[in-house]
């Protein structure tokens, strides 16, 4: 049995990583000591005559973080039925699977929710004890440990070899580099104001951080943990997706209704792609980004605009959009890139969408204010 992991960012790009074959554990139980009298057979309930073997585990499991209810919804990706709900902690948002598919890493925050323009002085004090990265067992859904990396973590990324975790800490304007074996912070890199999105370039050599208050993306060398470049992109950048060859990065700009394109080799801004609204509808507010496995399409969720946009990266132009749900944020593509899940905050559901027909196939109720989506796929 092997696994393919697809994370989700918001709003981040879906990722396809290494496969593993988990061991099968056998549990043997000892017999009770015998008494002097012959033991009576234990009472049993006969199985129905037509009982068959237990159902196999689902090929696809979908994990959804619910920011307000503080839990994780697990969906059977084969049947689209909710399998379980697991408690996590305060404000779970960003979520990424480990490369081997055994664990999920979830950003937890004790900072009170605050939208743009809200005066922090009017909010209750943050609960710093609630800040951390929760590591969840992907099969049992149990919280294994909480790694305290920084204040108000929002998004994160896992290195392809599963040894490093990169965490954006919004309140301290830092990127924490965590050694996953020990669960300790190796170093913290100062970035810009309000860091949010974290994405590793496909070759693993550079990690990028979007900084909402700074209007820029920061490029950091993963070998030296040194800053390479500050790349101005536009107001309130949220998430980043890369073409499979790592040549171009696409950044959602919430307050500009656009996607910025940058050269990920030269670390320089290239152009803006504007997402147009329709009639009197709200302006698109780009949030999550995913890129098709073949690099043919960039997908963008647009918050209060409720649409999923399609961008042709070869022409740097939008090719259409359709409504997927209320305030879609996180997005994750299924293997093959024909279907996707979006997390819809106000309606407390997840949409399964067909990217070929551009239709919603099903809406699945989850927890309160779903934020991020990640997949683990059993091969």
Report the location of each language-model feature.
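Compositionally biased, low-complexity segments enriched in small residues
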Residues: 4-9, 31, 270
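Bacterial N-terminal signal peptides
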Residues: 21-31
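Predominantly soluble domains enriched in secretory-pathway, periplasmic, or organellar proteins
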Residues: 34-379
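Bacterial N-terminal signal peptides that target proteins for export
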Residues: 6, 11-23
């Amino acid at each position: 049995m092997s696994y393919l992991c697809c994370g989700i960012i918001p709003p981040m790009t879906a990722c396809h990583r290494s496969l593993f074959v988990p061991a099968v554990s056998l549990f043997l139980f000892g017999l009770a000591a015998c008494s002097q009298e012959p033991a009576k057979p234990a009472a049993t309930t006969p199985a129905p005559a037509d009982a068959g073997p237990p159902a196999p585990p689902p090929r696809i499991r979908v994990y959804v973080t619910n920011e307000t209810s503080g839990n994780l919804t697990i969906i059977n990706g084969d049947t689209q039925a909710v399998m379980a709900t697991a408690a996590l902690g305060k404000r779970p948002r960003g979520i990424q699977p480990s490369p081997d598919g055994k664990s999920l890493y979830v950003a937890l925050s004790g900072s009170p929710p605050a939208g743009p323009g809200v005066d922090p002085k009017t909010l209750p004090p943050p609960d710093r004890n609630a800040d951390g990265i929760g590591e969840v067992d992907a099969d049992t859904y149990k919280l294994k440990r909480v790694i305290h990396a920084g204040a108000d973590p929002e998004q994160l990324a896992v290195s392809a070899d599963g040894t490093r975790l990169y965490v954006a800490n919004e309140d301290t304007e830092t990127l924490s580099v965590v050694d996953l074996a020990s669960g300790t912070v190796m170093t913290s890199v100062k970035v810009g104001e309000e860091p949010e999105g974290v994405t590793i370039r496909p070759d693993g050599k550079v990690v990028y951080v979007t900084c909402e208050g700074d209007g820029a993306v920061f490029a950091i060398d993963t070998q030296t943990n040194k800053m390479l470049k500050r790349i101005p992109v536009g107001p309130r950048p949220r998430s980043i997706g890369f073409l499979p060859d790592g040549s171009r990065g696409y950044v959602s700009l919430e307050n500009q209704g656009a996607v910025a394109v940058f050269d990920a080799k030269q670390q320089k801004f290239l152009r803006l792609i504007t997402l147009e609204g329709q009639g009197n509808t709200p302006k698109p507010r780009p949030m999550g980004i995913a890129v098709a496995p073949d690099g043919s399409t960039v997908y963008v969720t647009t918050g209060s605009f409720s649409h999923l946009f399609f961008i042709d990266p070869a022409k740097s132009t939008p090719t259409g959009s359709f409504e997927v749900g209320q305030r879609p944020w996180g997005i994750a593509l299924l293997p093959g890139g024909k279907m996707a899940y979006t997390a819809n905050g106000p309606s407390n559901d997840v949409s399964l969408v067909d990217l070929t027909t551009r239709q919603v196939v099903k809406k699945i109720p989850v927890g309160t204010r779903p934020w991020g989506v990640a997949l683990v796929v059993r091969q």
